[in-house]
Curated annotation (Swiss-Prot):
A zinc finger (H1C3-type) spans 129-151. GO terms for molecular function: zinc ion binding. Interacts with host PPP2R1A; the interaction inhibits PP2A activity. It holds the Pfam family Papo_T_antigen. A zinc finger (C4-type) spans 109-123. This is Small t antigen. SUPFAM superfamilies: Chaperone J-domain, T-antigen specific domain-like. Gene3D superfamilies: DnaJ domain, Small t-antigen, unique domain.
Length: 194
């Protein structure tokens, strides 16, 4: 995420969003701030047209950049849709079963890093991390290259424990499902049993 915008653009976007700097990278929180600021700055609502244009430009550059980061990582697990055609978030995709699909067995899923046969979202994103890193042979330095729980913990400086899973769930929920490059039909379904 830090490579998408220049330092000045990042600071300008943080300022325009009225976002605390420590929340940079929390896409869901940033998206809420963006929507709120759009309502405040919209020229039809008496807002500042110049600031609105700057906000839209920076926000679009960030979203397009995050989308491109994922596209450049290599072969896709699923057919990609255009960024304007797929706006469903991960939580919208799985609606009522999102939290159960995210992590099937927290203790087991957190412990079994690269060898898990589980198909919950947490384990699938971890497997994806290992496949990408094996082929690219570089660490994840930018949030958005990888959305696994380990990179999330590293990015925000948190230990990988059971207590992290709810924060991770909240972080992943608003992210467009297409950015995660998951085959949604392979994700664990609690309704169908083990």
């Amino acid at each position: 995420m830090d490579r998408i915008l220049t330092k000045e653009e990042k600071q300008a976007l943080i300022s325009l969003l009225d976002l605390e700097p420590q929340y940079w990278g929390d896409y869901g929180r940033m998206q809420k701030c963006y929507k709120k600021k759009c309502l405040q700055l919209h020229p039809d609502k008496g807002g500042n047209e110049e600031l609105m244009q700057q906000l839209n430009t920076l926000w679009t550059k960030l979203k397009d950049g995050l989308y491109r980061v994922r596209l450049l990582l290599g072969p896709s697990q699923v057919r990609r849709l255009g960024k304007d055609q797929w706006n469903l978030s991960l939580q919208q995709t799985f609606s009522g079963t999102y939290f159960r699909r995210l992590c099937r067995l927290p203790i087991t899923c957190l412990r079994n890093k690269g060898i898990s046969t589980c198909n919950c979202i947490l384990c699938l994103l971890r497997k994806q991390h290992f496949l990408l890193k094996k082929s690219w042979r570089v660490p994840c330095l930018v949030l958005g290259e990888c959305y696994c729980i380990d990179c999330f913990a590293l990015w925000f400086g948190l230990p990988v424990t059971n207590m992290l899973v709810p924060l991770y769930a909240q972080f992943l929920a608003p992210i467009p499902v297409d950015w995660l490059d998951l085959n949604v039909h392979e994700v664990y379904n609690p309704a169908s049993g083990p």
